[in-house]
């Protein structure tokens, strides 16, 4: 069940849903607006000939922070990682779904490629997969609204929430745009 604004506020007030920093003006009818942090991960196109999800490629991306007061410019066809300004902590009975903002989508900005689902038990900043599909550069301002997080109540609490030893939670506690750790659980079929 999708939580309404009053349910979202009740979960936050009770301390079950953690959002830091929390700004009540970001609560929408059935979602919470999320803001863009100031750190980005850009791909180093000259370090590798290709991306291999089975291998650890430590120098695949570099962390970039724009000069204070300046935006990050995302060029047409470019893909970078960003993250939410807010740190989210979900209880074992709520899952999240990150969606883009309609106004930004109409400018050609995609907020996430595939990873819009947030497991119950997750705690950390949400990594954003930012793409510019427009034919002009888009400026990304730290602190701007970048997406919205919908919360879904599970039918029962998760038996093994994200962060538990059984869940294999490789992104638990992440801060800033976190590169892929796909090699940690990559499986090849034989």
UniProtKB/Swiss-Prot annotation:
The active site is at residue 129. It catalyses: dCTP + 2 H2O = dUMP + NH4(+) + diphosphate. Its EC number is 3.5.4.30. DCTP binds at residues 101-106, 119, 127-129, 148, 162, 170, 174. Residues 160-190 are annotated as: Disordered. The record marks 116-117 as: Important for bifunctional activity. Residues 171-190 have a biased composition (Polar residues). Pfam families: DCD. Pathway: Pyrimidine metabolism; dUMP biosynthesis; dUMP from dCTP: step 1/1. Bifunctional enzyme that catalyzes both the deamination of dCTP to dUTP and the hydrolysis of dUTP to dUMP without releasing the toxic dUTP intermediate. Belongs to the dCTP deaminase family. This is dCTP deaminase, dUMP-forming.
């Amino acid at each position: 069940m999708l939580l309404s604004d009053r349910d979202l506020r009740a979960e936050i007030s009770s301390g079950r849903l953690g959002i830091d920093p929390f700004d009540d003006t970001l609560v929408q009818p059935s979602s919470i607006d999320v803001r863009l942090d100031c750190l980005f991960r850009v791909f180093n196109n000259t370090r590798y000939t290709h991306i291999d999800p089975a291998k650890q490629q430590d120098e695949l991306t570099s962390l970039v922070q724009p000069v204070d007061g300046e935006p990050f410019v995302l060029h047409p066809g470019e893909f970078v990682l960003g993250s939410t300004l807010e740190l989210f902590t979900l209880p074992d009975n709520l899952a999240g779904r990150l969606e883009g903002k309609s106004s930004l989508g109409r400018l050609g900005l995609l907020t996430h490629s595939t990873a819009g689902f947030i497991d119950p038990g997750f705690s950390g900043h949400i990594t954003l997969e930012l793409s510019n599909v427009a034919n002009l550069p888009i400026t990304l301002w730290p602190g701007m609204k970048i997406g919205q997080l919908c919360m879904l109540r599970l039918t029962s609490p998760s038996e093994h929430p994200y962060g538990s030893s059984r869940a294999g939670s490789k992104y638990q506690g992440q801060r800033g745009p976190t590169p892929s750790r796909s090699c940690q659980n990559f499986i090849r079929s034989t």
